[in-house]
Amino acid sequence: MKRMSKFARRCAALMLAVVLLCMAAPAAFAAEGDTLPAGATTMGGANTTLIPNEEENCLSWLFGSGDTITMPYLNVKGQGLRRNVTLDLEDCLVGITYTELGSIGSYVSDAAAQQAWKAQAVAIHSYLEYHKKYGSSANALVYTPVDQIPSSARSAIRRAVSEVKDEVLTCNGSVIDAVWSASAGYNTQTGVYGTCSGLDAWGTDVPYLQSVESPYEEQYHNLMRRIIGKDYRYIEYNDSKTGQPYESADTTHKDLGGFVQYNTFVSNGKSYRYIGQFVSSRYCFDFSADENGTPCMNYYGFGHGVGMSQCGMVGYAQEQGMGYRDILRHYYTGVSFGTVGSGSSNGGLFGWLWSLLGLQ
């Protein structure tokens, strides 16, 4: 009797699958031949076709997403901000990791580069999954199509990414918003090189975004400048030739992102205002005079300074031989490691039916 019941259940599930496929397939495969659907674009690399939202949802519902990731919005190098980008997960992480860190294997040991790339890839994956979950945009990231990456760098980065592509960072069971910046710089609040907390930078206390030391900022900011093409220490001069250093400064005028919009300072009893955004968050700069006594502002770091520092990450991997998990645990307080997307293609309606049929 049990065998008959199991057989009947499998037959019913199979019939349901056939009916649903007949109903849904025409909408999913309306394009003829090899012609891409209207609005679709091939962006380079494996399985990187941008397909309309409706068809993407239909295909995912039927077959599951497999080793792909779909972002509502993502910047693609050379193409700008694109909507509903579906990429092979590994390609996606390789492309964004290359954009973020470049060929650091040319400047540090291969072992250090592998750990740094792994840490970056896990942070990227966590960031993408967080913004997918909460329906927000990941347009701060730029994906470099894998066929545009030099072959030596591509193979080295892919070797690192392939080992961690399913890993994400979690806090209390939920994937985290794993933000990072190029260089944390000198934190004048704590008096050490280190990151800013989410509370310091944005006014929001996030348990895993706390201020931590990052001792290799000074040592590696020149390295990161060569890699990414930006200098992480800037000196701005005012129009005063008084020879006096700043006596005081008001840096409380910030935008919603926590960046100082303008700075009012006092030099030799006269008030000046520097208008324009700083290149780093509050607490990541100080005030002094240059060798000629001209007042100047020293900026340390590049970016918001919250979460993982790329300079610090490379430094920990190179100088201490730290592994990617220890690096991530250092910069993201109290996190755990989880997995998202196991590489299985068993998702979607048919995945459920195959399970019901006992074929998995």
What are these regions (language model features)?
Residues 2-360:
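Conserved, single-site charged/polar hotspot
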